[in-house]
């Protein structure tokens, strides 16, 4: 049996609602996981938008495009609102006979015994668990109570997410333009909705946050490429960008997954997909261990999960850091080198396809 502790249930989904400002670009591999868990059909029935092309550039002459057709795929992935993902997964958990969801429960302390962990709740109750999975986000209580440290730093950028209505059909291409102050990205959504992502210095993002939607519309028109067309902003939110990596993912009877284990620069929208890769790997390793009659909550078994995921997450984090460092520099020789790099990437054929397959988890 599984017990899920959650401070609050996610809000129910209403088809007539405006989109969530928080959007995830769900890769083909993540869709595969959601299908295997039996939740994808319910999520798809709410609201998703397939994207088939991904483009990035700084100079128009140095333009890289990835196309689903190159990999003979029907789509590269789907743009899904976070509230849609959360509601779909929550409903599946609530309906599962082996799962108990405790809403309003909060962890007070955690004590590891020989074979079990005692979870002391703020409401006075104690739960005993053979395996504790910390899937409680970037500021993970489970990680902190387990005494697991993190390697972390703050990027010199913040990120603004803007829900917009488009005068033109948003299409099925997502794109990102690099600028000296930070990337500008476009994520197509359902109907005539889209999401814009604006990376910039924290002070600049705070300035944008203080604007009315009419003022923000003028700023978008001035700072996004002309191909965006006319858009009308309807909602916006912002957050600072922090890179974190837990020094370890596991202890006896404990495993960290997703943002509790690692956060990444959202440049390529890989954060949620890395978390889903963690879940996929942990499920597979636990099932294999049970099938072999091993103690599936033991440190040797859980270390297999850490070995499989930590290096992959580090590679993706480091790749995003290289992009961030390379495209945050406005020196002319650096700009020339990075644009030559983009031109080379566009012509790299097989290498380009391999990079795309890796990003999609294929």
Predicted feature locations:
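C-terminal helical "tail/cap" subdomain of flavin- and related membrane-associated enzymes
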Residues: 284-362
């Amino acid at each position: 049996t599984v017990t899920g502790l959650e401070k609050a249930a996610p809000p129910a989904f209403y088809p007539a609602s405006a989109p969530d400002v928080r959007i995830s670009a769900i890769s083909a591999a993540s869709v595969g996981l959601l299908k295997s868990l039996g939740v994808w059909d319910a999520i798809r029935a709410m609201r998703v938008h397939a994207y088939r092309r991904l483009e990035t550039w700084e100079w128009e002459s140095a333009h890289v495009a990835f196309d689903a057709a190159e990999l003979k795929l029907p789509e590269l992935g789907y743009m899904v609102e976070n509230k849609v993902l959360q509601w779909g997964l929550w409903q599946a958990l609530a309906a599962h006979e082996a799962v108990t969801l405790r809403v309003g429960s909060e962890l007070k302390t955690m004590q590891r015994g020989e074979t079990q962990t005692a979870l002391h709740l703020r409401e006075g109750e104690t739960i005993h668990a053979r395996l504790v999975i910390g899937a409680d986000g970037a500021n993970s209580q489970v990680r902190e109570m387990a005494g697991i440290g993190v390697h972390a730093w703050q990027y010199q950028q913040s990120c603004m997410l803007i829900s917009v209505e488009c005068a033109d059909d948003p299409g099925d291409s997502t794109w990102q333009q690099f600028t000296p102050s930070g990337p500008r990205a476009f994520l197509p959504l359902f109907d005539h909705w889209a999401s814009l992502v604006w990376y910039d210095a924290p002070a600049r993002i705070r300035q944008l946050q203080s604007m009315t939607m009419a003022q923000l519309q003028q700023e978008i028109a001035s700072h996004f490429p002309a191909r965006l067309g006319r858009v009308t902003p309807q909602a916006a939110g912002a957050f600072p960008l922090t890179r974190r990596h837990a020094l370890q993912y596991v202890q006896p009877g404990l495993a960290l997954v997703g943002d509790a284990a690692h956060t990444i620069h959202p440049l390529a929208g890989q954060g949620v997909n890395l978390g889903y890769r963690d879940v996929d790997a942990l499920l597979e390793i636990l099932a294999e261990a049970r099938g072999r009659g091993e103690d599936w909550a033991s440190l040797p078994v859980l270390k297999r999960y850490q070995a499989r995921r930590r290096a992959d997450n580090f590679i993706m984090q480091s790749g995003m850091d290289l992009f961030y460092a390379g495209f945050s520099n406005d020196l002319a020789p650096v700009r020339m080198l990075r644009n030559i790099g983009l031109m080379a990437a566009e012509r790299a054929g097989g290498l380009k396809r391999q990079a795309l397959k890796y990003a999609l988890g294929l």
